[in-house]
């Protein structure tokens, strides 16, 4: 991967790179290197099928190595822990999973934006695109393990040519990394544009699934929306870092004061039904847990002037705060911090606010 990573052109177009969440334990320096040198167009996803290479269904030999949702649940729970530690939001399954197994991922991998499966068939699709248990998008990579632009183009050509613009069309493919690079993806986009001018968007996996959630009426991470604006109290780093989708230390928001108090405010430009929020503190970025934000509250507003409390946390020591709140309609969200941790300088690695279109 390091050879591909150093190829000229990386960062010019969104690409999703599969890595192992186990790097947290057996290769933390490697994981840090990739995060530290990633561009805003590089997105990391978990390789098959979570923590370690697990071949659940062998498509070539038509063999289920496991077909039990109960049997796979401990593995999925363990995977969830390492997804949080590694910051990975997408898993590509090797090759397929059944309904019981999809339910296990939906139930125990709360951190996931979505799953991709490997569809080895030709059109029409063998594997359906679906939302598992009303909260986890599952999309097939068709083609999978494509060895060049021509292969992907041949699979997508007819579908894109028939696109009428009435609703979004989501397509996912997997390329052989040792045979494809950024230049190939650029060439693919140019060829697809000729089929449907102005309608082709190549995007990161986290953005892909976030847009899919929005298009299908599911709660989605509002902080990834392109029109959101962020304001903060005095800070040492850019306010954009509180909602860039990364919990890496170099992309952490840091308060400009050390009096323990700080605030972060989002304007989503219109009202949404807010139902969940996630705060990733200093510990989630690899810093000591003693620097995690201790006391804070989530406030909501429709005009940016009158605020109401939606949730309050006191004495927090955990690196991640993940809370389902009573659904509330709001345009503005504010995180108000009153105790920033050991040195009283607030550090927020990332914030996610989940809402649905009204």
Show which residues each predicted segment covers.
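Aromatic, loop-rich ligand-recognition surfaces of beta-strand-rich domains
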Residues: 236-237, 246-309, 314-358
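Catalytic grooves of carbohydrate-active enzymes
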Residues: 1-2, 22, 86-216
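Predominantly extracellular/luminal regions of secreted and cell-surface proteins
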Residues: 219-247
């Amino acid at each position: 991967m390091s050879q591909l990573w150093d190829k000229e052109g990386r960062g010019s177009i969104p690409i999703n790179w599969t890595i192992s969440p186990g790097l947290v334990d057996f290769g933390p320096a490697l994981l840090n290197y990739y995060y530290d040198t990633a561009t805003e167009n590089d997105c990391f996803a978990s390789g098959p099928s979570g923590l370690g290479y697990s071949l659940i269904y062998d498509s070539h030999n038509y063999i289920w190595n496991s077909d039990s949702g109960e049997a796979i649940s401990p593995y999925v729970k363990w995977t969830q822990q390492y997804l949080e530690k590694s910051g990975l939001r997408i898993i590509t399954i090797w090759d397929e999973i059944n309904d019981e197994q999809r339910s296990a991922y939906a139930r125990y991998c709360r951190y996931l934006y979505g799953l991709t499966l490997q569809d080895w068939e030709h059109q029409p699709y063998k594997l359906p695109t679906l939302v598992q248990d009303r909260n986890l998008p599952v999309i097939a990579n068709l083609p999978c393990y494509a060895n060049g632009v021509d292969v992907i183009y041949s699979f997508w050509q007819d579908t894109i040519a028939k696109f009428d613009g009435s609703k979004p069309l989501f397509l996912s493919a997997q390329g052989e990394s040792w045979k494809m690079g950024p230049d190939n993806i650029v060439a693919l986009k140019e060829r697809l544009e000729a089929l449907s001018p102005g309608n082709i968007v190549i995007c990161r996996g986290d953005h892909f699934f976030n847009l899919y959630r929005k298009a299908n009426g599911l709660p989605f991470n509002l902080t990834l929306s392109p029109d959101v604006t962020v304001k903060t109290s005095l800070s040492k780093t850019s306010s954009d870092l509180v909602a860039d989708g990364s919990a890496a230390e170099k992309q952490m928001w840091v308060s400009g004061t050390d009096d323990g108090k700080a605030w972060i405010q989002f304007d989503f430009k219109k009202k949404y039904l807010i139902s969940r929020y996630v705060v990733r503190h200093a510990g989630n970025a690899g810093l000591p847990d003693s620097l995690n934000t201790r006391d804070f509250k989530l406030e909501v507003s429709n005009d940016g002037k009158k605020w109401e409390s939606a949730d309050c946390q006191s004495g927090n020591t955990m690196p991640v705060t993940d809370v389902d709140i009573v659904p509330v309609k709001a345009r503005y969200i504010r995180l108000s911090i009153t105790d920033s941790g050991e040195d009283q300088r607030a550090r927020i690695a990332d914030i996610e606010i989940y809402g649905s279109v009204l």
